[in-house]
Amino acid sequence: MPKFFNEVWLRDMSPKTMQGVVDFLGNLRNGVRPHNLPGDLKLLAGPWLSNEEAKVYFVFEIDDPTETFEAFAERVADGLFLKRRLTLIQDWDGARSFSKYLSGRQLKAA
């Protein structure tokens, strides 16, 4: 299943925002998800809070990340999140496989 590194910018680090974020991500960490997150979403690592800015990070796997839109947009509407960046990531076996592929291919003339 595809894995994603998720960076989420928080509205701020006020007590109300932080409590909402801690509750939401704490529940997700314990396997409790809101009704509008798909059942195949699995938190793999994190969450972590940035020391430099109002941001949290976590890694999850999901078959179709577009299915997280409603749950994320709801947190934006509730004033917890500002924006996010989802980065599709590859495990190290995948990186080795890609390196082997690059090393073995023939350069074609343009």
What is the predicted function of each stretch?
Residues M1-K55, D63-E70, Q90-A110:
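Short S/T/G/P-rich N-terminal loop/turn motif that feeds into the first structured element of a domain
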Residues P38, A77-D78:
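Generic structural signal for alpha-helix starts
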Residues A71-R75:
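Short, aromatic/basic amphipathic alpha-helical patches
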Residues D78-D93:
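Conserved short beta-strand edge segments in small beta-sheet-based binding/regulatory domains
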